[in-house]
Every structure is written in C-alpha cells, then in structure tokens.
Amino acid sequence: MNAEKLVVDWLNADPGLRPATASLSMPPDASSTSPTAHITVERTGGTESPFVSRPLLAIQTWAASRWNASSLAVDVSRRVRHITDIDEVADVDILSITDFPSPDGRPRYQVTCQLTIKTNYTESEEA
C-alpha cells in the first residue's frame, strides 16, 4: 500500500478542504506571484516490517497568506486524525504543525505525522 497515495486520496475525499486539493507535487501553474491553496504529501522516512508499515509523512499546506496556510494545516490535521476509519490504518500520530515558508516566500505550513498501517506480507515478497 502506498501511504502517500492513501493520504492524498483521503484528503481529496473531504469536501471541507476545498478549494484546496492534495497531490504528490505542486501544480505546474503554481508560483509565488499566483499562490493557490494546495496540499502536498510526501514520505520522509519511517519503518517497514513484515506486518506493519510506519511511514513518516510531511503534509504541506500552501495558501495565499500565512493565516490561510495555518488554517488549512489545522483542517488537514483534523482530517488525518480520522484516517483510522480506513481498515488498514491502525493508528496515526500528529507529530507537529509548523510554519514552514517556502524558499520563494510562499506561505506554507507543514503537518508531520506517522501512520501505522497493517500490511499483507507473503513469503513471495521475501525474494
């Protein structure tokens, strides 16, 4: 199971986060002169074992102002707290919500979280 895609799909299923949408990368038309509300998800680490995946994820919220980026980050963290509604997700820890301006000056916040996901291990995966 791809944890990044799982979180992107989970966030995009919530109409309360719109007009922001989540993806694995920034939209091609995004720029510092035309900031739009957007959410990016990337795996930054974590552990894997035969039966459990514990991905560490950085979820970044981009918006026209620092306040809007912060507000979106809070909304995202609330949504992610309920990802355990998906059967394979056993637990989620929200580790931080941080002001994280982009190098080009765009307002951005980062939600760092760690999921605990049940995996389906088979002997054929050992090879």
Report residues per predicted region.
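Small/polar-rich, solvent-exposed N-terminal microdomains that initiate assembly or binding
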Residues: 1-47, 67, 87
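Short, charged interaction patches at domain edges and termini
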Residues: 1-10, 44-52, 92-127
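Hydrophobic alpha-helical membrane-association signature
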Residues: 3, 72-76
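Broad gene-expression machinery/nucleic-acid interaction feature
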Residues: 36-38, 56-58, 108-112
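Short glycine-rich, basic-tinged beta-strand/loop micro-motifs
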Residues: 51-64
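Short, conserved charged micro-motifs
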Residues: 67-71, 122
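A common structural junction motif
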Residues: 77-86
